[in-house]
């Protein structure tokens, strides 16, 4: 037996550690490897570089509203392939794939509840659902959110994260821009606050309608906000755009948005602003996250 074989015979093979998938993730900005559970506790904000990663609609609403107060609205509304649209793939197949991937029926989730004990209606986009694109169901759910806010005489908050209108629904998608804007006019007539929170990215028909119609337009840090994307603009005007173009820090310098708020500070900031606008006592930052339990809304059959 050679000396190499003798060494080999004395080596005990080590057992390969098995790490479940999804335990670790990597920051999109700095590349830091992060523990998934810790990142979720930090509201999907990188603890090293403060990069705000994309957050699911449900996690966002649960992080905003008081525990035990959330009631979902418009969940019975489902998209339909009325036009029998097909590009490289059938629209109904794209819908089925997005629904399976996200667990959502469409790209907007609406809930009513309380924020530091104050009644609020909140909506949030699920960007993972076809890029948060706006179709008939998104428009109908947003209008439902406005109607609920009017009924409860309370504020409305919407977190936008969208690539714009859903091309598979053609003009029916574009119609939602006017539909949602008209609904918000009723909020203005009643004197009820509507706060729009712009997250990364907020583009196209969503930015050209209700996303920029807030009484206050708040953005998260480094969020991409605009109509056409930077690459499309550069190709059209044939000029190099300035650094940070269409990012929230660039837009606040130009007066296009009102403020930038970090995600961990968003809940208290929104509660403070809404309390002031509704002429209510300022929220206690140390108060536990327990709100008034709101009774479930009665089941209603609605058509988009």
UniProtKB/Swiss-Prot annotation:
Pathway noted in the entry: Lipid metabolism; malonyl-CoA biosynthesis; malonyl-CoA from acetyl-CoA: step 1/1
Cofactor stoichiometry and binding remark: Binds 1 zinc ion per subunit.
Purpose of the protein: Component of the acetyl coenzyme A carboxylase (ACC) complex. Biotin carboxylase (BC) catalyzes the carboxylation of biotin on its carrier protein (BCCP) and then the CO(2) group is transferred by the transcarboxylase to acetyl-CoA to form malonyl-CoA.
HAMAP family for this protein: AcetylCoA_CT_beta
Organism: Salmonella paratyphi A (strain AKU_12601)
GO annotation, biological process: fatty acid biosynthetic process; malonyl-CoA biosynthetic process
Domain of life where this protein originates: Bacteria
Protein name: Acetyl-coenzyme A carboxylase carboxyl transferase subunit beta
EC code(s) of this entry: 2.1.3.15
Binding site for Zn(2+): 27, 30, 46, 49
Segments forming C4-type zinc fingers: 27-49
Leading EC class: transferase
Main location: cytoplasm
One GO CC term on file: acetate CoA-transferase complex
Keyword field: ATP-binding, Cytoplasm, Fatty acid biosynthesis, Fatty acid metabolism, Lipid biosynthesis, Lipid metabolism, Metal-binding, Nucleotide-binding, Transferase, Zinc, Zinc-finger
GO molecular function: acetyl-CoA carboxylase activity; ATP binding; carboxyl- or carbamoyltransferase activity; zinc ion binding
Places the protein is found: Cytoplasm
Catalytic activities: N(6)-carboxybiotinyl-L-lysyl-[protein] + acetyl-CoA = N(6)-biotinyl-L-lysyl-[protein] + malonyl-CoA
Pfam families membership: Carboxyl_trans (PF01039), Zn_ribbon_ACC (PF17848)
Lineage, opening ranks: Bacteria, Pseudomonadati, Pseudomonadota, Gammaproteobacteria, Enterobacterales
Subunit record text: Acetyl-CoA carboxylase is a heterohexamer composed of biotin carboxyl carrier protein (AccB), biotin carboxylase (AccC) and two subunits each of ACCase subunit alpha (AccA) and ACCase subunit beta (AccD).
InterPro entries noted in UniProt: AcCoA_carboxyl_beta (IPR034733), Acetyl_CoA_COase_Trfase_b_su (IPR000438), ClpP/crotonase-like_dom_sf (IPR029045), COA_CT_N (IPR011762), Znf-ACC (IPR041010)
Ranges of residues in domain CoA carboxyltransferase N-terminal: 23-292
Family: Belongs to the AccD/PCCB family.
Cofactor(s), names only, from the UniProt record: Zn(2+)
Stretches the record annotates as Disordered: 284-304
């Amino acid at each position: 037996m050679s000396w190499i074989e003798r060494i080999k015979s004395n080596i005990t093979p080590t057992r390969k550690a098995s790490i479940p998938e999804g335990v670790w993730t990597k920051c999109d900005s700095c590349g830091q490897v992060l523990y998934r559970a810790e990142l979720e506790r930090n509201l999907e904000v990188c603890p090293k570089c403060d990069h705000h990663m994309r957050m699911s609609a449900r996690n966002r609403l649960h992080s905003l509203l008081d525990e035990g107060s959330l009631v979902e609205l418009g969940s019975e509304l489902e998209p339909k392939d009325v036009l029998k649209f097909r590009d490289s793939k059938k629209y109904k197949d794209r819908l089925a794939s997005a629904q399976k991937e996200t667990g959502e029926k469409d790209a907007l989730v609406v809930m009513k509840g309380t924020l530091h004990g104050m009644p609020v209606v909140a909506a949030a986009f699920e960007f993972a659902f076809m890029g948060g694109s706006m179709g008939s169901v998104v428009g109908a759910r947003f209008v439902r959110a406005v109607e609920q806010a009017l009924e409860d005489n309370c504020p409305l908050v919407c977190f936008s994260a969208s690539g714009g209108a859903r091309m598979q629904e053609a003009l029916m998608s574009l119609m939602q821009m006017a539909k949602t804007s008209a609904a918000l006019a009723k909020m203005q007539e009643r004197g009820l606050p509507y706060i729009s929170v712009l997250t990364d990215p907020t583009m196209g028909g969503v930015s050209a309608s209700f996303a920029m119609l807030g009484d206050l337009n708040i953005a998260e840090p480094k969020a991409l906000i605009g109509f056409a994307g930077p690459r499309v603009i550069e190709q059209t005007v044939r000029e190099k755009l300035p650094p940070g173009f269409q990012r929230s820090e660039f837009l606040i310098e130009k007066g296009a948005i009102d403020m930038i708020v970090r995600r961990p500070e968003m809940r208290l900031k929104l509660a403070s602003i809404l309390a002031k606008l509704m002429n209510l006592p300022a929220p206690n930052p140390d108060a536990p996250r327990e709100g008034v339990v709101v009774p479930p809304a009665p089941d209603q059959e609605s058509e988009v």
